[in-house]
Amino acid sequence: MLLAVLYCLLWSFQTSAGHFPRACVSSKNLMEKECCPPWSGDRSPCGQLSGRGSCQNILLSNAPLGPQFPFTGVDDRESWPSVFYNRTCQCSGNFMGFNCGNCKFGFWGPNCTERRLLVRRNIFDLSAPEKDKFFAYLTLAKHTISSDYVIPIGTYGQMKNGSTPMFNDINIYDLFVWMHYYVSMDALLGGSEIWRDIDFAHEAPAFLPWHRLFLLRWEQEIQKLTGDENFTIPYWDWRDAEKCDICTDEYMGGQHPTNPNLLSPASFFSSWQIVCSRLEEYNSHQSLCNGTPEGPLRRNPGNHDKSRTPRLPSSADVEFCLSLTQYESGSMDKAANFSFRNTLEGFASPLTGIADASQSSMHNALHIYMNGTMSQVQGSANDPIFLLHHAFVDSIFEQWLRRHRPLQEVYPEANAPIGHNRESYMVPFIPLYRNGDFFISSKDLGYDYSYLQDSDPDSFQDYIKSYLEQASRIWSWLLGAAMVGAVLTALLAGLVSLLCRHKRKQLPEEKQPLLMEKEDYHSLYQSHL
C-alpha cells in the first residue's frame, strides 16, 4: 500500500541526482562542451532571468598532483569535467543544481532562504513504520527511472569526441551505484592496457568529503522523489559489534536457508539485481558499465578472510582515530602514517596509526566482513548496507572536525593523488563541487547525527580535549625532560646544601633557610597532567 502511494507521488516532483544531465548529452552539447540547461521557472539558462545563476567558464585548479598516476590525457575523469564540458551553470546565493533549480544543502523554500537542520538517526531507533518507510523509499528509487540524468556507456573517444552520444537510462538507486563504480574504476589506456592505481574517491584525502557529498545527493534525491523533505539516511553504529546485527529479515536481510551467499527470500532486498560489478569484464573490453542487471545481491557476513580482518572495529579503535591530529600525511595515499583519513578508511592500524597493507580495518573492515557484493569497491553501493555504513563513517568524520576544528587549509591543496587536491572538482558530479567544500561541519550542510546532539561541541571540556590529547602525545618527551631536570635539581640542591651547612655555623638561627620536607614535585606535575 505504501509503495502504491509513493508511485502516485512520483510524478509530482522533479528529480535531480548527480552525473550527466539528460539536457546536456546531445551531440551539440558535447561538441560545444556546454551544460547550461534552462530552469523551468523562467526557461532561461541557469535561471539567469530570475537571478539564480548564469552560464560560466569552468575554472580548473592547476595545483600539482602526486606521482600515482603518471599519464595525461588518457582518462575522461582527468581535470573533471573538462573532457565533456568547459561551461556549466554557476549558481548565485543559496541556489544549486545543474540548472540552479535547487537549494544548497541546508536551505529550503522557493527562494532557498529557509534554514533547516535534519537529523540522521540510528536505524535501531526507528519505529517499525519509519523503518518500513525507509525500505519502501529505497525500493521506489530502485524501480524509478531518473528523469533528469543518464549514464554514459562509452568513453568520450568512443563517442567520437561527442559527435555520437552513447548514454543509457538508469533507475535512481542504480544511478548512484554507477557513480560509485565510475569514480573508482580503473583507467582504460587503450588496447588491453589498464592502470589500477587510480581512484577519485578512495585511498586519498577526498575519501571522506566525497562520500559526504555522495550521501547528501542520495538523500536529496530520495527527498525529491518521495516529497518527504524530512527524510534522512539512518546509520548503523557498528562499534563493538560481534556480528552483523542488521543482517536480519527485519532489517537489511538475513541469510538464505539453502544458499548462505544469498539473502533470505523474506528480505526486502532479496529480489534486487545488482549492476556494475564485473570490473574485469569491462576492462577486457575497454568498456564502461552500462547498467545491465548482473544477478542478485550477495552477502555472507563473517565468513571472510579473518587473517586480513580479524574483527569488527571497536570503540577504542574509533577513539584512537579521533585522537589523530593530522588529517593527511606523507604520500597522502594508502601508505600514509598517522593520518586520520587513512586510519579511518582502514589502511592504517587503529592501534598505532601505521599503514599496514596486510590488514583491512575500520571502514574497510566492514566491507570485507560482508563477504559479498559490498566487498568489491566498484559495486559495493549495490548493497543498501553501504548507506548505513557510510553514514556512520561520516559521523566519525564529523566528530573529528568538531574535536580538532581544522581550518580548510588543513585539507591538502596540492600534491595529492589525481582528483584529491582541495580545489579539484569531484568526479562525477554535475553540478560541480570541490573537495574542500565538504571539509566543514555537517551542521553547515544542514544535518546532524542524533548521538552527537547529546554533547555540546562548544563546551569547555570539548574545546580543550584536543590540546590534552596533544599533551599526552608529547608525554614521553616531557618525562625525559623532567628526569633531566630532576638530576640538575638534585645537583643544585646538593651544592646549595653544602653552602648552607657551611653558612649555618655563621648565621643566627632566625636567618637560616626554611627548607621544606622532602616533596615530590614530579608526581604532582604528573597528576595534574
Curated annotation (Swiss-Prot):
Manner of cofactor binding, per the entry note: Binds 2 copper ions per subunit.
Taxonomic lineage of the native organism: Eukaryota, Metazoa, Chordata, Craniata, Vertebrata
Cellular component terms (Gene Ontology): cytoplasm; Golgi-associated vesicle; intracellular membrane-bounded organelle; lysosome; melanosome; melanosome membrane; perinuclear region of cytoplasm
Annotated localization: Melanosome membrane; Melanosome
Name of this chain's protein: Tyrosinase
Cofactor(s) required for function per UniProt: Cu(2+)
Residues reported in the UniProt entry to bind Cu cation A: H180, H202, H211
InterPro entries: Di-copper_centre_dom_sf (IPR008922), Tyrosinase/Hemocyanin (IPR050316), Tyrosinase_Cu-bd (IPR002227)
Organism, as annotated: Homo sapiens
Annotated SUPFAM superfamilies: Di-copper centre-containing domain
Signal peptide (residue range): 1-18
